[in-house]
Design a protein with these regions (language model features):
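Nucleotide-activated chemistry modules centered on ATP-dependent adenylation/adenylyltransferase
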Residues: 1-206
């Protein structure tokens, strides 16, 4: 059985983005830098080998979107600009218009294009209806999430048994740089996973 583990360098670990690797894919995947720390090892080895980029500054953004314009990239790929739509307050009233729901993310506070007497945040993005939902800070708090697109990268009979027996205690995160959050993983009759956190979490977003 092939397993996906976290890299030695926690600041550069990519396992969060590789969750969907199946056994078939893992069997053909090699991570040559997994056991190395970038600053202590990788840069030193690169310098010793005469690599010209050994001390090159790092890029923190997606490499194929160097200008950081994610919305523009998606629009170009789709071949048309994002459609405008309604910005909706927590009571259902329309409080503004947006120029593309893809430009908003849950928890966002700045650049909303809506002026109100108190701080407001994006609490939901409804792509199907092309609406952006706003609310207050308290509306961003949740204690659980459901997972539709989940995968066991390494099937484990013991974990399956624990899951069916009442749940598995896990350390989970829903954001790349986030520290592990204590939670319990359970599965309902339809096979959908439910992750219940020990402590309330802020701005849980799909994806």
């Amino acid at each position: 059985t092939w397993q996906l583990h976290r890299g030695e360098d926690s600041k550069k670990d990519q396992s969060y983005f590789l969750y969907s690797l199946t056994q078939e894919r893992l069997a053909h995947t090699i991570f040559p830098l997994a056991g190395l720390d970038k600053e202590r090892n990788v840069r030193r080895i690169a310098a010793e080998q005469g690599f010209t980029n050994a001390q090159k500054a790092e890029s923190e953004d997606i490499c194929f979107i160097p200008d950081g314009d994610y919305a523009g990239y998606i629009e170009r790929r789709c071949g048309h600009p994002a459609a405008p739509g309604d910005i909706v307050w927590r009571d259902g009233s329309v409080v503004g218009r947006h120029n593309g729901a893809l430009r908003y993310t849950i928890g966002q506070r700045k650049g909303l294009g809506v002026a109100m007497a108190h701080p407001v945040y994006v609490t939901g993005v409804d792509a199907a209806n092309n609406t952006v939902h706003l609310g207050e800070a308290e509306d961003l708090t949740a204690t659980a999430l459901t997972a539709d697109d989940w995968i066991w990268s390494a099937p484990d009979a013991r974990m399956e048994a624990e899951l069916d027996a009442g749940g598995i205690r896990v350390g989970a995160k829903y954001r790349y740089r986030q520290k592990d959050q204590a939670a319990t993983l359970t599965r309902d009759e339809d096979g959908q996973m439910l992750l219940t956190f020990d402590e309330p979490q802020r701005a849980i977003a799909p994806g």
